Amino acid sequence: MIVRKEVKRLHKFFAFKQKDESETELNIYGDIVSMKWFENDVTHFDFAEELSKVTTPNLTVRINSYGGEVSQGLGIYNLLKEWNGHVTTVCDGFACSAASVVFVAGKTRVMPKTSLLMIHNAWTIASGDSEDFKKMAEDLEKINEPIVQS
């Protein structure tokens, strides 16, 4: 007879944790996406829902992420910029692509010497005719504007 034990999940990659009465900490240790495929993925919707529960005046956002979808990263950026408390962002490893946008939302930003911030122009994979590609190039230029402004 095989007995299966339920395994408790010990670590949540995207989790808000109140450290004390004055500070809440959040880890973004996965991809920033519009639809979750893996446990450690972060969506703008989930982030907004969790951020609305924070009652402390300070929030520390710890990031180790290759990034993801720019729309989701910009959404999280805007939530952090509009939040009433003090936001500190810490790059624990990588803050790449959409995660770099989230990183710059912090009023205080911490980059240890062994961490890496990677920012790039928007890119995509496309198919179509020459008109489709012209339109895609225009769209990518428009997408770059808010990234640069952040």
Language model features: what each stretch is:
Residues M1-S150:
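Terminal-region recognition feature
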